Amino acid sequence: MEPSPDVPLEEITWHSPQHVQMMGGFLHSNNILFYFAESPFFDPTSNNASLALQAMHNENLRPFIETRGAFEGRLKTMQGLEFIVAHDPLLEAAAANAAAVARGEQPKEASNVWVIRKQMRRRSAAMGGQDDVQVLATYFVVGDSVFMAPSVWSVVGRRMLSTVTSLTKVLSTASALLTFSPSYGHSYLPHVPKSLEPTQLGQQSAQQSKETTPMPDMSGDKTTSRSALADASTTTLNASALQDARDFAETLNLLARYGNEYIDETPLAGEPGSFIFTKASASAAEQLSVAGAGAQASRQNIRSGATTPVPFGAGRPASVQPDSTKGKAADRPPAATKDKGKKRKSKIGSMSQ
């Protein structure tokens, strides 16, 4: 039975109950290699096939195929590709049972798992007449099913392929979630602005409430609408709490940076590009001392009943009339004089008539 060239041998499981029935109904040490020779894992150009074919046509070689010990002993005298049994469960069980009986224990049942190796044998004169054996593959026979053991390269390669495939899927999924902004940089979470104006915040909350407002349920089922309203309120509260936390952190940052700075006592005057310093009339300490003295004097005047005027600048400003206004008021005639002149003119007019 030849395997398909497109299917790897590591993915094939072969069994043949017909051959098991032809070989006595069960597998043992003397027929396991001949049962394996019927599988697609067997190489017809190996020394096993050559020795079996010679024994069928040469009676002198027939004893070599009657037992597995004689067959493998003959293979060791040949060079080339061969298949041998590396693990015999029947022999192992027999040795274990003999030891158990010697210890007075109950014997155990055999595992019925065979291990067959494919190897290349070469003569080596440099090794003192010993053979150079290179293992090419390993096979397992469990019951009547034959499996090929995967190589180390195959196992590591498949594990690496699985790891790389999983990482590729994760990166492709995460790349769609990555966002970038000049303020926050790269992030996988949605950005929330640091500060929003009250009007914008009100408009945003109104838009969110409009978008999340459920339509009237004509069937009378209000469970869906209540859950939608609860979700909308929870989302709004979470956004508000996050914004408050950001504002508080920004306030602490500004306090730490500019908490020890104050506005200059000497103000600036002018336009941008031509600012000049204006001389203050009095420093803050002097203004405070003058204000304190004025307040104390006013309290003393109230107690004594005197009409001493409050110093200018300490209390309310005094209404002082300028000198120019005084001169004009002195030159102006009184109102009574104007009235008398008018009466005299009226009398003179009546007499002339």
From Swiss-Prot:
InterPro entries: Mediator_Med6, Mediator_Med6_sf. Keywords: Activator, Nucleus, Transcription, Transcription regulation. Residues 193-231, 296-353 are annotated as: Disordered. Pfam families: Med6. Component of the Mediator complex, a coactivator involved in the regulated transcription of nearly all RNA polymerase II-dependent genes. Mediator functions as a bridge to convey information from gene-specific regulatory proteins to the basal RNA polymerase II transcription machinery. Mediator is recruited to promoters by direct interactions with regulatory proteins and serves as a scaffold for the assembly of a functional preinitiation complex with RNA polymerase II and the general transcription factors. Belongs to the Mediator complex subunit 6 family. This is Mediator of RNA polymerase II transcription subunit 6.
